[in-house]
Every structure is written in C-alpha cells, then in structure tokens.
C-alpha cells in the first residue's frame, strides 16, 4: 500500500513530538498552571482555525463523439478557508481521550477546464460550507510543566450544504475523511490553549455523475471527462478549553 507523502511526513512528526517533546522542555521544573484540569471526566471548549481544501480530479480521456472535443480538468488553486466549532472530550485514561468536534468549514476551490482539441479554457469557482462532526482518539504524552504534546487520529463525516449550487462539476453532499494530526496542550493560568495541525484525507469518490439538473446537454462534457474526485484538507486549529 502506497502511503501519501503528506501522511508519511505527518506521522514522523507526530511520533517525534510524542516521544521527544517533553525532553525538549526538561531543563527545569516550573509551577504548573491548572494542575487538576486533566482529571475531569469531561472537557468542553471552542475553537477557531484555518484550512486549505484540496480537490483531486481524475480525468478519463473522454472524447465527445459529436464534436471531437476532449476536456481535462484540474483544481489549480484553493483559497484559505475558515473553521469554527465546539469541543467535547471524554477522558478514557491518563493518556487517552475521545473527542467529538461539531464544526463548520467555509472554503473555496477553483477548477480550470482545458479543451485539448481547441485550447479553449473554462473555469469554475466552488464555494463550500461543510457541517462536519469529527470523532478522534487523542493519545497524549505525560505532562511536563505546562506543556503536553499529543497525536490524534479519527474520522470526519461531513455534509456540504452548498453542493447543489455547483454548476459545471458537482460534488456529492456527503463525504467521509480519515484524519490524523498532532498538537500540544499549553496550560495557561486561567484556561488551556491548544494549537493543532491535522491532515484529512477523503475516503470516497465525491464526484456527482447524475446530473439530471443540467438543461444544456453540452454542459455534461465536464462531468463526463472525469472518473472521480476526492478531497483533502490541511487544518490549523486553536482550541480554548
């Protein structure tokens, strides 16, 4: 099984952070802020963040039998998106926690279409609003002073509220993603601040091939030229607990 290069690098970084993080900060003991906050059975908070939505398109070389046109598509750019949500964590043990994170993702993707026969170009901007409910397992290293690194892994089911408004190419509303990442609990005097970076990889084909909504048959060529589409995300999140 071939491992995605981004996943490989993130796994190595997570392992290094989890195993070596405390040693980097082990010069001296300091007074601990919020020393008993991790003893609570349930933890709650909120978060804001930024993300980068990636759309991978797989062209199939389809040629229109009527015109001889052959189109290829590429997601050439994606704007920086915004994320906001709430955090609920159930403490399973001293090092394990189960997290549920109802989230709203707002983002934009841009697709360029190119006709290989005529060199004609076309484009589509896809604005998306996702309601997601990630469920993650959190594995934390022992706390040292006011620093505690951790890694997470889980799944993220989501629904795109705006998929019905997409024109040339449309994606399915439901998507399921695998996510993994790393972060660090930083214990402040009155709250816990948690920066986290994670990578999300789509597990299914989100290309909608059933375009009964199209009234112009010539617009179907963009969908016919693609076999499948998958989505990925890099998410930088700041939690406040």
List the model feature ranges, each with a label.
Residues 1-38, 239-241:
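Cleavable N-terminal export/targeting peptides
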Residues 26-80, 239-241:
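Short glycine/proline- and aromatic-enriched beta-strand/turn motifs that initiate or cap beta-hairpins
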Residues 31, 173, 186-241:
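Predominantly the C-terminal beta-signal and adjacent terminal strand-loop region
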Residues 39, 93, 142-146, 187-191, ...:
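Outer-membrane beta-barrel channels and translocator barrels
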Residues 40-42, 78-82, 127-133, 147, ...:
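Residues that define the transmembrane beta-barrel architecture of outer-membrane proteins
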Residues 46-50, 82-90, 102-104, 133-141, ...:
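Residues on the lipid-exposed face of transmembrane beta-strands in outer-membrane beta-barrel proteins
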Residues 51-55, 105-109, 156-162, 200-206:
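Structural signature of outer-membrane beta-barrel domains
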Residues 58-75, 108-129, 161-171, 207-226:
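Flexible, solvent-exposed loop segments that connect beta-strands
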């Amino acid at each position: 099984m071939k491992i995605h290069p981004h996943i490989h690098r993130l796994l190595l970084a997570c392992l290094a952070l989890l195993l070596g993080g405390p040693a980097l900060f082990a010069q001296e003991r300091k007074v601990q802020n919020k020393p008993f906050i991790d003893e609570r059975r349930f933890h709650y908070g909120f978060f804001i963040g930024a993300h980068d939505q990636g759309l991978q398109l797989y062209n199939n070389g389809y040629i229109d039998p009527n015109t001889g046109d052959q189109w290829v598509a590429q997601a050439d750019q994606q704007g920086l998106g915004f994320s906001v949500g709430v955090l609920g964590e159930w403490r399973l043990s001293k090092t394990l926690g189960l997290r549920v994170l109802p989230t709203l993702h707002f983002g934009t993707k841009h697709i360029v279409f190119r006709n290989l026969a005529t060199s004609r170009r076309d484009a589509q901007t896809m604005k998306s609003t996702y309601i997601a409910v990630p469920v993650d397992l959190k594995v934390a290293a022992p706390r040292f002073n006011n620093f505690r690194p951790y890694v997470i892994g889980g799944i993220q089911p989501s629904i795109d509220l705006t998929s019905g408004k997409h024109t040339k190419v449309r994606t399915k509303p439901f998507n399921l993603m695998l996510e993994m990442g790393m972060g660090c609990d930083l214990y402040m005097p009155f709250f816990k601040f948690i920066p986290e970076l994670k990578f999300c990889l789509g597990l299914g084909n989100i290309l909608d091939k059933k375009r009964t909504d199209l009234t112009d048959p010539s617009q179907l060529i963009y969908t016919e030229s693609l076999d499948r589409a998958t989505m990925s995300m890099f998410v930088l999140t700041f939690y406040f607990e």
